[in-house]
């Protein structure tokens, strides 16, 4: 975030330009680089009887274990009305996890999905209680939900450092696809989803996408004026995606304070976007430099993950090495513009999610060592 100490006049001129940028100038730089994890699943896992263990085999609460492993921040998602899915990740469940992090002195990122369940590039289903609303009504819905959740946290002593307006919004957010009874998208004969409501779809309704995002940004600032409000896209290696999507927001008058990226080399290769993990990481680091310069703001890798196979030490060691590289180059190769790296759901069982970083019985694998030995 800080420029080099030389060329003070150039820095001042550049700062003046930034005030005109879509990326709102951030407050005084925090000197820390943040190492974090999204552990939103933890309370649901605990309720099923799952336990977590430290390096020495002692049972530990998951948030405390993350801190013990060298992390200083957590990321936690929130859904609008997940009552059909056990009420996990509602505002009350969010508060439980936030208080654990707060009491450990860890920074908190809140990830608004603006859906009753999962929101990602394949689906951004409009909450059931908002369905059929007009654009103006939906801006009010979004703002009211955002303020309700954040005020609830504030009233309980929680002050999130970062707030995401949407989750992986490459195609915008608040647009619905035809889904089955379990909430998963139904695919047609060609393997495609069918969009049934396109309110905030970035390609179909770009102005509405920007307007909805702006409503979320303003709502965040109304409760926590000093919070860092983020736009979050997937495929951090894809410069063209970021130029297009952020350009849509910029053209629509939306603002943000920081750009969040997802980086999953495994999925990049699985989807045929890149041939190998090393190129994926290289392209992501280059994109961090690119978007931070083009849009004048800092960046975070808010999701990453690597293949875990506790029966194959070589796979685990490769994951540790790749994560260490991501952290190291985010610190050393981005001109100070990348401010953190967060692992997505490392505590998950491999049988539940194969890009976690723990064993089936709740012990951290060597992948987690990267958070403490990334410089080696």
Cite the ranges covered by each PLM segment.
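Glycoside hydrolase catalytic-domain groove-lining segments
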Residues: 56, 60-63, 222-229, 236-312, ...
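Active-site beta-loop-alpha junctions enriched in small/polar residues
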Residues: 40-42, 79-81, 113-117, 165-170, ...
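Boundary/entry segment of secreted carbohydrate-active catalytic domains
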Residues: 28-65
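Hydrophobic faces of well-ordered beta-strands that scaffold small-molecule active sites
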Residues: 35-39, 74-76, 108-112, 161-165, ...
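Positively charged n-region of N-terminal signal peptides that target proteins for export
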Residues: 1-7
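Aromatic-rich peripheral "rim/lid" segments of glycoside hydrolase catalytic domains that contact
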Residues: 47-51, 118, 180-191, 195, ...
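C-terminal motif of bacterial Sec signal peptides marking the signal peptidase cleavage site
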Residues: 19-22
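Substrate-binding cleft and catalytic face of glycoside hydrolase catalytic domains
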Residues: 64-205, 209-228, 234
């Amino acid at each position: 975030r800080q420029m080099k100490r030389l060329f003070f006049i150039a820095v001042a001129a550049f700062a003046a330009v930034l005030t005109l940028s879509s990326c709102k100038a951030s407050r005084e730089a925090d000197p820390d680089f943040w190492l974090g994890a999204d552990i939103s699943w933890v309370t649901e896992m605990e309720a099923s009887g799952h336990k977590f263990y430290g390096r020495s085999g002692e049972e530990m609460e998951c948030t405390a274990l993350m801190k013990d492993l060298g992390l200083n921040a957590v990321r936690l998602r929130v859904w609008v009305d997940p009552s059909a899915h056990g009420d996990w990740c509602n505002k009350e469940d969010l508060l439980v996890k936030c208080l654990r992090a707060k009491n450990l002195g860890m920074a908190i990122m809140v990830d608004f999905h603006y859906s009753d369940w999962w929101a990602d590039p394949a689906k951004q289903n409009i909450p059931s209680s908002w369905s059929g609303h007009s654009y103006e009504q939906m801006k009010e819905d979004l703002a009211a939900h955002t303020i309700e959740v954040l005020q609830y946290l504030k009233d309980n002593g929680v002050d999130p450092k970062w707030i995401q307006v949407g989750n992986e919004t490459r195609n915008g957010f608040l647009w619905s696809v035809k889904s089955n009874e379990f909430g998963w998208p139904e695919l047609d004969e060609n393997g495609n989803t069918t969009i049934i409501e396109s309110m905030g779809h970035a390609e179909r309704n770009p102005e509405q996408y920007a307007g909805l995002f702006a409503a979320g940004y303003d709502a965040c600032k109304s409760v926590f004026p000093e919070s860092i409000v983020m736009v979050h896209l997937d495929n951090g290696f894809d410069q063209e995606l970021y130029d297009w999507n952020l350009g849509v927001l910029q053209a629509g008058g939306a603002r943000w304070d920081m750009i969040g990226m997802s980086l999953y080399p495994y999925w990049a290769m699985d989807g045929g976007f890149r041939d190998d993990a090393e190129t994926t990481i290289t392209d992501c680091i280059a994109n961090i430099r690119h978007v931070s310069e083009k849009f004048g703001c800092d960046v975070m890798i808010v999701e990453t993950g690597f293949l875990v196979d506790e029966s194959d030490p070589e796979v685990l060691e490769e994951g540790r090495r790749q994560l260490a590289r991501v952290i190291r180059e985010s610190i050393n190769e981005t001109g100070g513009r990348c401010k953190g790296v967060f692992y997505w759901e490392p505590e998950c069982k491999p049988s539940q999610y194969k890009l976690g970083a723990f064993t089936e019985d709740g012990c951290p694998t060597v992948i987690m060592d990267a958070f403490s030995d990334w410089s080696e």
